[in-house]
């Protein structure tokens, strides 16, 4: 365990997380920004910036490693995160800080399921998981207009944080036309194949997705800036780990652990926002009376209860919120919340693995749905439909807090190559043309953010 870290408090009324990130991350190989918008209107109270790395925990091509050594694993590889974090754990004594004061931030790709269940999944060019303990952590408190720098040497960052920000426009940037991994007719055919599996009783539902690839000279952070304006969401993230970048604006929790409480929040059922209050309420009533949407939502709530039942004490799993409407900037969703009290021998990693991947990006029953996804989708999912989030340092009882979002409404980069992807839930009466269009509808904000990012980076926005 490390020593106590220094905390420096500054007034932040002239700074934003975006401008601060651009100042302090310049030239850094490792950096992240985590932000939140609550229910489409107000920014969440805290934003987090991580700079540099104390160490990394990477699982790639079956090899688990840190910055300087390869690690053995006997059970699932992610179980190593607790002992690894213990090495870098530090104490921070400050009453004004939120519960997350340090730990590991990163992403887990969809193909990690191969190490949890007996499902073979295509590996991608991205690591199966990648976590970083940052050298410096900057926390914004938007309510009190304060910023806290947690570091061995916070004075080093202070001058960068308080320095004027100079943005240099770059007009000669390009983005190639995104190319799909499906022809339209080919997608229709795989929807029909999925429906056949449903009729034969293999599954109730499966989520089939369409991926697009493109090349660009855009700085991915400008895409993040555009996306956070166009599609603000409860989970907004930008992770730069070397030449790997994962960024997004996700509406959906994958799983969360705070103390002994584990929570999942299934989202299923969507309508656009109305142009007037009356139209908005009419769309809400229409959504809550849509039998197909309700049936799909109830199935995913049951799946969440079953997942938590594997790691929570008997009789403690309950539905805390049932089918409430949550409104975001462009859409409204039906949302439920399921929680339970952790068994004494289970921790945050157990919760993560019990709920991964979310039923909303796989289907039900989950394992058979993922086998069918593997058969019908032509390319690996990579980080898409995985998770982004953090594990906090273990406390004195060895408990880690964890918060993770499903990696949807997101971009993934390896150098100048970019990917984006979206899925549609296929059920017995799905219409292939509508499901194809749903994948495009979900990507609309992402395509738009590519256009806006070019204007921002070119100084035209």
UniProtKB/Swiss-Prot annotation:
EC number(s)?
Answer: 4.1.3.27
- For this entry, the protein name equals Anthranilate synthase component 1
Known cofactor(s): Mg(2+)
* Molecular function (Gene Ontology), one example: metal ion binding
The cofactor note reads:
Binds 1 Mg(2+) ion per subunit.
Give the protein family.
Answer: Belongs to the anthranilate synthase component I family.
Q: Which GO terms describe its biological process?
A: L-tryptophan biosynthetic process
Q: Which reaction does it catalyse?
A: chorismate + L-glutamine = anthranilate + pyruvate + L-glutamate + H(+)
Which residues are involved in binding chorismate?
269-270, 384, 409, 423-425
Annotated Mg(2+) binding lies at 296, 438
Residues recorded as binding L-tryptophan, renumbered to this chain, are 36, 234-236
Q: How does it assemble?
A: Heterotetramer consisting of two non-identical subunits: a beta subunit (TrpG) and a large alpha subunit (TrpE).
Which keywords belong to this entry?
Amino-acid biosynthesis, Aromatic amino acid biosynthesis, Lyase, Magnesium, Metal-binding, Tryptophan biosynthesis
Xref: SUPFAM superfamilies: ADC synthase
Q: Which Gene3D superfamilies would you find in this protein's record? A: Anthranilate synthase
Function of the molecule: Part of a heterotetrameric complex that catalyzes the two-step biosynthesis of anthranilate, an intermediate in the biosynthesis of L-tryptophan. In the first step, the glutamine-binding beta subunit (TrpG) of anthranilate synthase (AS) provides the glutamine amidotransferase activity which generates ammonia as a substrate that, along with chorismate, is used in the second step, catalyzed by the large alpha subunit of AS (TrpE) to produce anthranilate. In the absence of TrpG, TrpE can synthesize anthranilate directly from chorismate and high concentrations of ammonia.
User: Which pathway does UniProt place it in?
Assistant: Amino-acid biosynthesis; L-tryptophan biosynthesis; L-tryptophan from chorismate: step 1/5
Q: Which Pfam families match?
A: Anth_synt_I_N (PF04715), Chorismate_bind (PF00425)
| Lineage: superkingdom | Bacteria
Please give the activity regulation comment for this entry.
Feedback inhibited by tryptophan.
């Amino acid at each position: 365990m490390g020593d106590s870290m220094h905390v420096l408090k500054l007034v932040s009324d002239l700074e934003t997380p975006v401008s601060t990130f651009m100042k302090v991350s310049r030239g850094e190989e490792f950096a992240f920004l985590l932000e939140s918008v609550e229910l489409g209107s107000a920014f969440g109270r805290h934003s987090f910036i991580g700079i540099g790395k104390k160490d990394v925990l990477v699982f790639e091509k079956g090899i688990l490693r840190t910055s300087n050594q390869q690690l053995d694993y006997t059970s699932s590889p992610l179980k190593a995160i607790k002992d690894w974090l213990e090495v870098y754990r530090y104490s921070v004594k400050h009453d004004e800080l939120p519960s997350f004061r340090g730990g590991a931030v990163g992403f887990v790709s969809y193909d990690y399921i191969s190490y949890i269940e007996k499902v073979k999944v295509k590996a991608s060019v991205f690591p199966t998981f990648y976590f970083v303990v940052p050298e410096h952590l900057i926390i914004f408190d938007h309510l009190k207009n304060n910023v806290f720098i947690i570091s061995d040497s916070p004075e080093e960052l202070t001058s960068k944080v308080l320095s004027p920000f100079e943005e240099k426009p770059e007009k000669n940037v390009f983005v190639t036309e995104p190319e799909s991994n499906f022809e339209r007719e080919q997608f229709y055919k795989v929807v029909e194949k999925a429906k056949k599996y449903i009729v034969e009783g293999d599954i109730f539902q499966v989520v089939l997705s369409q991926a697009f690839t493109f090349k660009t000279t855009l700085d991915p952070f400008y895409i993040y800036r555009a996306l956070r304006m166009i599609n603000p969401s409860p989970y907004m993230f930008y992770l730069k780990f070397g030449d790997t970048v994962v960024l997004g604006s996700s509406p959906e929790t994958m799983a969360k652990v705070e103390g002994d409480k584990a929570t999942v929040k299934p989202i299923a059922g969507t309508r656009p926002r109305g142009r007037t209050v009356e139209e908005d309420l009419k769309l809400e009533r229409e959504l809550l009376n849509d039998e197909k949407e309700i049936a799909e939502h109830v199935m995913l709530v049951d799946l969440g209860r079953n997942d938590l039942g594997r790691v929570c004490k008997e009789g403690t799993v309950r539905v805390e919120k049932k089918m409430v409407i949550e409104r975001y900037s462009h859409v409204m969703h039906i949302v439920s919340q399921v929680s339970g009290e952790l068994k004494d021998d289970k921790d945050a990693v157990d919760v993560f693995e019990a709920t991964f991947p979310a039923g909303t990006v796989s289907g039900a029953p989950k394992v058979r749905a993922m086998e069918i996804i593997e058969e019908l989708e032509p390319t690996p999912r990579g980080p898409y439909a995985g998770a982004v989030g953090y594990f906090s340092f273990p406390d004195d009882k060895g408990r880690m807090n964890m918060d993770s979002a499903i990696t949807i409404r997101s971009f993934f980069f390896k150098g100048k190559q970019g990917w984006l992807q979206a899925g549609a839930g296929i059920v017995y009466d799905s219409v292939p043309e509508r499901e194809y269009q749903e994948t495009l509808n979900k990507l609309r904000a992402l395509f738009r953010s590519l256009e806006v990012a070019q204007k921002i980076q070119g100084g035209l926005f």
